[in-house]
Each structure stands twice: as C-alpha cells, then as structure tokens.
Amino acid sequence: MEADFEYFKPHILPITQMLLQRGFVRNECVNVNAPVGKIVGTRWCRQCAGHWEKEFLTHTDADGGTFYTMTGQYVNEEPDAKDTDMWALAHGYISIQSVSIDLTRDGTV
C-alpha cells in the first residue's frame, strides 16, 4: 500500500511558514505527522510514551547484504493522555513535536 498525502498538501506551506517564523533552537528538529482522514486542526504536543512489538523484519538485498524494515505494532503506554502525538492523530489533528536531535547520554563523553 502506498501512502497518499494529497489531502495534507494544503497544510504543508502554512506549517512550514509558521515553523520558519518561529525559528529553531540549537539541536532542535520538528516532527510533523498527519492523521488518517479529515484534518480538524493542528496541535503542538509531546511524543507519546510507547514501544514497538515485533518491530523488524530481516531481508537480504540483491548483493547479499542484510537490511531491516520496521513493521509490527506500536503500543501506546498512555492512551488517556491528551497532550500526546498519538492522541492528536487519533482525533484528527496534525501533530507537531519539537525534538532534540542530540541523543548523547550525559556523562558518557
């Protein structure tokens, strides 16, 4: 199945303009996700706590190399939290999260 984001197109430019006007802090990136179906709005939210079960399939490419694809099922560990990306998406909102890209564990370097 191939994803169809045609319905999301009208939202891309306004979100991009808002993010550029807002600016970014050091080591920040922004994660934007679109809900399936009708979009009712946009929400800034935090990432939901959860985990993937049965998450990777192993494949072999034409050259004999190994690669993995993500699959499985996401388990939401806080389904009643209304300030998360998963809640926003489940309720028709575009979810936006500010994410830190420096994943270095403090005290290890």
Could you say what each language-model-derived stretch is?
Residues 3-109:
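Electrostatically charged, flexible surface regions
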